[in-house]
Amino acid sequence: SSSGSFFSSDAGALSAPDEKKEPEEEKGPDLTGLALNPLTGLYIDEETALNRPAAVVINNHHKALPQSGIAKADILYEVLAEGEITRLIAIFNDFSAEKIGPVRSARNYFTYFALDNGAVFIHHGGSPSGYEAVKARSVNNIDGMREEGSLFWRDPKRVNMAGMYEHSSYTSAEKILEGIKKYGYDAEDTGIRLFS
């Protein structure tokens, strides 16, 4: 019969053609000049990937809003500071943020976020146990209490508003790099990485 079933021998129209095509080799993206960001696993500029990260304590109180620079952070932790008040620990590998803050004080356990990411710890002041932890754990740090007016500045709009002084300390990526150089800290990646 001329109407064969799929399983019959005359279903030749369904058989594979005689000529075999070689599969085309897929080309991946051009990764020239790129390297893995050790914090995110995403590709970034090779030189940027070599930066040592900075861990900045940023105020998360409702009076501190809006914060500056957090969109440039590679990792953003929200951590309890006291009571129901939280702070952000922003980890930066890319030093392009022009304004970061408001920067707040060190707490004992905040130092672990810097150490775990091989980062320089950036804060403005600290609790007694925060300062003890920085010293006891040999945490490379830049403190706004020592560097106000040079590596840190007060936002003029906030500093003159009632109840806003503690929400007015800022720094920048450029100032953090200046501080790393000033204190003689290693500016290159310390080898602690989430991605490699």
Region annotations inferred by a language model:
Residues 1-4:
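Sec-dependent N-terminal signal peptides of Gram-positive bacterial secreted proteins and lipoproteins
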Residues 6-14, 25-77, 82-196:
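A surface/extracellular/periplasmic glyco- and lipid-processing/surface-interacting theme
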